[in-house]
Each structure stands twice: as C-alpha cells, then as structure tokens.
A protein has these predicted regions:
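Short, flexible turn/loop "capping" segments at secondary-structure junctions
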Residues: 8-13, 57-61, 106
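Short amphipathic alpha-helices in soluble, non-transmembrane regions
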Residues: 78-87
C-alpha cells in the first residue's frame, strides 16, 4: 500500500494487516500528541501511547493508538470540532462504556481514545500495554493471536473482538 504518511502509517477500512515494529512509531505518537495537546489545551490531562505500536518489537497494525485522559468523560464530546480540524472523525464509543473514539484519515493512521484520566479504562489500557512490554511470554501469545486473527477475521471489528478476551485477561 502506498502511503503519504512519513512514518509508513495507515490502513484502509476493513483491512487487517500487521507490520513489523518500526522504531519511529514512538516519534509519530509524540508528534501527534503535541498537535492534539496544542489544539485541545487544558482539557487534556495526559496523552499516552498504547496499543501494539507502543510495544517495542511487536508486530502491529500500522495505526498509532493514543489514550487521551480527561477529567470528565463528557469532555470527549466537546472535542469533536477541534479534533475535526486536526483531521479526526468522531466514531462514538463503539460500545465501550466511558470511552470516546476519534479516527484520523480515510486511510487510518491514528486512533485517539478519550477516557477519564486515572479511571478504569485508563488503568486497563495502560495495564495491558505495560504487561506486553514487560512479559515476553504474554507478548508472544498475543502476537500469535493477532497473526491468526489478521489472516482469518473478515472485518476489523471481528479482529478486534477476537482479541478482547485476551486483552481483558491480561490488563491488570
């Protein structure tokens, strides 16, 4: 796939493809986090890089996942216009409680997940990332699952749903 993203990021809708880990992904995250912090101002308490692109050595869909921590979940709704100016579409909660999701680009390069800073979603997402970073056995098991799902899942939603039990079991 040709991409205009300088970091080789981007995945078309409903495509399930894993890329080798790229050591430039943390820089891609940092640059985008700075753009978001500048645009949203003090409503953002913190932004963390999470998901597989935040785990050195782990193959991942070439989409940067960002966790944006706010004081109140309804603040996610107040971000819609500012995030649109940055190229993000609001995707609702996707059935996840206490969660707002924004995606950047038709060829998706970034996903921004807005949750309450320090809340259950915040702790769960970062707990899973930290477990993958620290535990090579869990990381290898997760990679095997991701590779199977990338090959077999008919949609991106099915790919994500196929990982949910593993993620929940390893988040805390």
């Amino acid at each position: 796939m040709a991409t205009r993203d300088p970091y080789g990021l981007g995945l078309e809708a409903e495509v399930n493809r894993l890329s080798d880990y790229d050591p430039l992904w943390p820089r891609a995250f940092a640059e985008e986090a700075d753009r978001i912090k500048t645009a949203l101002g003090p409503v953002v308490i913190a932004i963390e890089h999470y998901g597989s692109t935040a785990v050195p050595g782990l193959r991942a869909k070439p989409i940067i996942d960002m966790l944006i921590g706010v004081a109140e979940i309804d603040q996610g709704l107040s971000m819609i216009e500012s995030m649109a100016h940055l190229g993000y579409d609001y995707a609702g909660s996707q059935g996840i409680p206490e969660h707002h999701i924004f995606g950047r680009g038709a060829v998706r390069t970034h996903l921004a997940h807005v949750v309450v800073h320090g809340g259950a979603q915040w702790k769960s997402c970062l707990g899973f990332r930290d477990r993958l970073r620290a535990d090579p056995v869990t990381r290898a098991r997760y990679l095997a699952l991701k590779e199977q799902l990338a090959a077999e899942a008919p949609t991106r939603a099915a790919y994500t749903a196929g990982k949910s039990e593993f993620v929940l079991a390893n988040s805390g």
